[in-house]
Amino acid sequence: LELAILMPLFLLIVAGVIDYGLLFWEKVVITNAVREGARAASRAADQGFGAKAELSPYQVRQVVQNYLDSAGVKAPNGQHLILSDETFSYFWSDTGSGIYLTVVLQNIPYRMLLLPAAQSIFSGRNSEEDLIYLNARITMAAEWTEPPTP
């Protein structure tokens, strides 16, 4: 009898540990993808008279996209996650103490695998609202002195 009472609670806890572990993994992957994009964006090609950025903003986005694809990050519908202008941004600023570039991933959707139904029960939301949105932002010093061309 005690097992019948405690088993559903135990299974819910195990499912929560698995789901939140996967959520944490995806957050780490997204952060690493942004970091790889910033590293690629910060590199400079020496042209003798000044350093120019090696990669265009589109190429930086492709570096981040390739990292996400290789890690197997998926959209909530199970398809590959495709970065758009709403989810990816890359910009730079000259602060006087150097040029800094920032790579941002925002509103990357994640759907819990085992607990979406339980999440709806406890929160009163419908399945369309089950998404959790992850963000990652990295700012890094640029090696170049001449900004990239779009």
PLM features: residue spans?
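Short, conserved structural patches
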Residues: 40-150
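Alpha-helical assembly-interface signal, strongest on the long, hydrophobic N-terminal helix that forms
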Residues: 1-68
